[in-house]
Each structure stands twice: as structure tokens, then as C-alpha cells.
Amino acid sequence: MENMKRTIVLSFLFVMTGIFTCIGVSTDASWLAMLGAIASAIFGTIISMIFESIDTHGQGMKLWMQHIKYWKQDIRLSIAYLFRIEVDGKYLLVKGNRLKKQFQPVGGVYKFYAEAKPTLEKWGFRPDTKMGNIDETDDLRIYIKGRHLLSFMEWFASMRDREYDPYREFYEELLETKLLPTEPFSRLKYRKVMVHNNGVLYSKYMRCNELVYADIFELELSTKQKELIKAAVARNPDMLCLASAEEMISQCYNGIEKNVGNNAEWLIGG
């Protein structure tokens, strides 16, 4: 509240100094010109103070502006993680569970714990089940009003009452399905290398405004693990592939059009 009051006061001063600056530039009267010069000097300082007084919850000015723009509108959130698994300059992709004809990175949406539900309910969240995930209402694939965007992202960054270990999807997609042997991949070494987040954009596919966020984790592989992955791809060409960066960008693996998910290029910063 104090930050809001300060921002309002500074905004008023911003307008007034802007007016006096314009008067000073356009007048021949010496005293008005001097007043305009003083106002101009103050003008830049006030701009800086306004930006400093805005509480962006650590999310930057772009998202702050968007949470104002979409204040009363529903925003779809898809908060996920993906594995960058590189073998000999190519990247391991797996056939999707829902989009059966597309290869995509190993990974999926984070889940929230039961303890987080009161917080999410405070923001009026509702699960998004358009992807057929009617039994997975703990997925961080939800709708909230734009005014709660900053609070949500601050909560997510705190890692409180939510999943933060990406191993679950690796296990479900590659080990539980027997595509890779369990024992050599029972313990993984990985690190977060980047984040995909372009802010709120309109999705033609989902027909709504959405924020798609993905943590990208790079898997560090031993020589043995790399050989096991290459063997698995050779055995299961309908389920696994090693795609080049160019194939991921073009969404076209092995000359077949649009058989790679549009999220694959996120692994390389796309």
C-alpha cells in the first residue's frame, strides 16, 4: 500500500514536471525557461524513482505491465520443466503421451502439493483440463486472473508446497516405459541451465492468453549412459529420436513435416 501511494505521488510529480518542461522549451520568458530547465532536471530523477517504487515481485517490468493489462482477464498458466539430453550433438526426444505423432523433450508440468491449494484458491485458480488431464488436477496447468500473476510467480519461485525435482517425468517417460534400463539411470546428475518465458501471449491453439514457462535442465551423461541412449533410439525408432538443432527449429525430424513439438527448440534457447 505504501509503495502504491508513493507511486501515485511520484506519477503526479512526473506529470507536473513534464508540463513545466514543455512550457520552458516553448516560451521566450526567461523565468519560465529557467523553471522549465529545473523541471527538466527533476524529470529524469522522478522517472527513476517511479520505476524503483514499483513492486514487481522480482518479475521485471514486462510482467508487471502485463499483470496490469490483463488485470480482470483469465490467463492460462503452463509451468513446466524439460530435459536437455544431448548425445553426440543431437538431442533426445520422446513421443508425446497426448500428441502421439510428435516427438518432444522429456519433461512435463510441475505439480503442486495439497498444502498449496489454499493459496491457489485465494487467487481463484481453476485447473485446465482441456488437454484431457481430467484426473491430474494437481498439475500447474491452471487459469488465474491477470492481477494475480506476480503473486503466483513469486510463490512459484519460492518452491514452497510444489514439486521441484524433475526426476518424476524422466522416470515416467523413459524408465517406467522400459525405453531405458532403470539401474543405470536411477541417479541423475543435472543442472538448470535456462528458462523459457516469453510472458503473456495469445495462443491460437488454446484460444486464450497464456503464460508458458519452462525450466530447462541439462542432463550430464556418462559414456555408458550415452551408449545406452543410442541403443534405445535404435531399438525404438517410433518412440525415441535424436534430433539436431536444425530439426528441432524446423519441427521436422528425418524429413517428416511437423513431427517435432514446438517446445523442442526451447532446449537451445528458441
Q: Across the structure, where does each feature detected by a protein language model lie?
A:
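N-terminal leader/linker segments that precede catalytic domains of diphosphate-processing enzymes
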Residues: 1-270
